[in-house]
Amino acid sequence: MADDAVVEEGSVEVSALAAGRPSWSWQRPGERARTPGRKAEDKEWVPVTKLGRLVKDMKIKSLEEIYLYSLPIKESEIIDFFLGSALKDEVLKIMPVQKQTRAGQRTRFKAFVAIGDYNGHVGLGVKCSKEVATAIRGAIILAKLSIIPVRRGYWGNKIGKPHTVPCKVTGRCGSVLVRLIPAPRGTGIVSAPVPKKLLMMAGIDDCYTSARGCTATLGNFAKATFDAISKTYSYLTPDLWKETVFTKSPYQEFTDHLAKTHTRVSVQRTQAAVQPS
């Protein structure tokens, strides 16, 4: 019961916890109010991967270019760079998990966070930590790194913008099996609250769903839905039969630029190390 109380307390002010600050302020009588420190967002992003350097130098123009060449994204700042303020995140659940040790039970908190721009990009992050705030922060970063493109389609005539899933897709995690079925325009999302949140964040307006297994296990339910959404690009439908002409990978295309910037950065680091402090 004590653990549940802690979780409820932690989930009241999610935005404050995720920002790493308490949702309350307290000071002694006569004490001067403390000024908040600089936010992490104010710091300039210094990329540490080749992909990050290309993105910051505007050599890669969109996320779709990264997905086209299946380049792994290792820095969450890349997602912030392209999607920025369009991204919205929501904590699906915070649950206590315990491990039996010789000293007794060790309790940690597990956070499930969904993130998306409501327009074709969605991600899911899971993180376990000693503190609720740290778990939420870590889950948000992992959700950004796991963001996938969502393919949308039509139920009948191709009128207006795509509004539903392009075909029937199935996702699975543990005993949970989630099936997404195209629906007519105006139907809405017919599903349980957890898949509904993920589908809305993915930008799908109309969809029928079918779920089997132990859907009370929220983690598996969310992961199965995310798996189903990721499979929308797995089916090669007739409109994708045209031969794709691939160009060089960005790593090959901008080899000279990467070598130049890498040399410059390494020289700066060497000079900084040589200079007396």
UniProtKB/Swiss-Prot annotation:
A GO term from the CC aspect: nucleolus
Subunit structure of this chain's protein: Component of the small ribosomal subunit.
InterPro entries named among the record's database cross-references: Ribosomal_Su5_D2-typ_SF, Ribosomal_uS5, Ribosomal_uS5_C, Ribosomal_uS5_euk/arc, Ribosomal_uS5_N, Ribosomal_uS5_N_CS, Ribsml_uS5_D2-typ_fold_subgr
Major localisation: cytoplasm
Family under the similarity heading: Belongs to the universal ribosomal protein uS5 family.
Basic and acidic residues bias locations: 29-40
Record-level Gene Ontology MF annotations: RNA binding; structural constituent of ribosome
Region annotation Disordered: where it falls in the sequence: 18-40
Protein name per Swiss-Prot or TrEMBL: Small ribosomal subunit protein uS5
Summary of the function given for this chain in its UniProt record: Component of the ribosome, a large ribonucleoprotein complex responsible for the synthesis of proteins in the cell. The small ribosomal subunit (SSU) binds messenger RNAs (mRNAs) and translates the encoded message by selecting cognate aminoacyl-transfer RNA (tRNA) molecules. The large subunit (LSU) contains the ribosomal catalytic site termed the peptidyl transferase center (PTC), which catalyzes the formation of peptide bonds, thereby polymerizing the amino acids delivered by tRNAs into a polypeptide chain.
GO BP term, pick one: translation
